[in-house]
Regions:
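Glyoxalase I/VOC metalloenzyme domain signal
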Residues: 1, 6-25, 44-204
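N-terminal low-complexity or amphipathic/hydrophobic leaders
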Residues: 28, 35-47
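A short beta-turn/loop motif at secondary-structure boundaries
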Residues: 32-35, 110-112
Length: 204
């Protein structure tokens, strides 16, 4: 697990919500130029972090949306999770071996408040059965991991993927080289529990 993506309709209100629930105020990260979003971050310790993301009103003409589900988001929820890998090409090969289409690797970057640049590449899985599966990120050499300079105080107590077909999901994750807790459910949903200054808090 590299990071969790918490989608919100409005970034400022999302930051306030997280501070109210956890006692930690996420720091504004920046814009994703051309992808229509902006974010704020908080560290979860151990090279893990929580990304709060929303549509950027200053990028209404963006050519593509970082997370299309944000268009129809009416309330805050976990919308994605990312796994860090050292070789996206190998990850793509693993996905193809399981008949899963991939998008990428795609280069990404974001200017930070201090002027430094975060750079990465992502690989996304595409297809009718990919809901609940992670996307993959490869941080470029020389890029400081966001967990190192984001507000701290929270840690990830647990994470699970709720799924309608747990055997398929477990088999697929294993084939992708990913270890995650999968539990049965009538719907596909992500659920995380954070240990915070205000106690354990659940997000879904």
């Amino acid at each position: 697990m590299d990071h969790l993506v918490f989608g919100v309709p409005d970034l400022a209100r999302g930051i306030e919500l997280l501070e109210h629930r956890t006692g930690v105020r996420a720091r504004f990260g920046g814009q994703h130029p051309g992808r229509g979003t902006h974010n704020a971050l908080m560290s979860l310790g151990g090279r893990q972090y929580l990304e709060i993301i929303a549509i950027d009103p200053m990028q209404v003409e963006a050519s593509s949306l970082h997370f299309p589900e944000l268009k129809h988001l009416s309330e805050p929820r976990l919308i994605a999770w990312a796994v860090a890998v050292e070789d996206l090409v190998e990850t793509a090969r693993r996905a193809t071996a399981q008949n899963i289409d991939t998008i990428g690797p795609l280069a990404g970057s974001r200017a930070q408040a201090d002027g430094s640049l975060l750079s990465w590449q992502t690989l996304r899985l595409s297809g009718p059965r990919t809901e609940g599966l992670p996307f993959f990120i490869e941080w470029q050499k020389g890029t400081a991991h966001p967990s190192q300079h984001s507000p701290s105080g929270c840690t990830l107590a647990s994470f699970e993927v709720e799924h309608t077909d747990i055997e398929w999901m477990r088999h697929t994750l294993k084939g992708l080289g990913v270890d995650a807790n999968v539990v049965p459910s009538a719907t596909v949903r992500l659920k995380a529990r954070l240990q915070t200054p205000k106690g354990e808090v659940e997000f879904g």
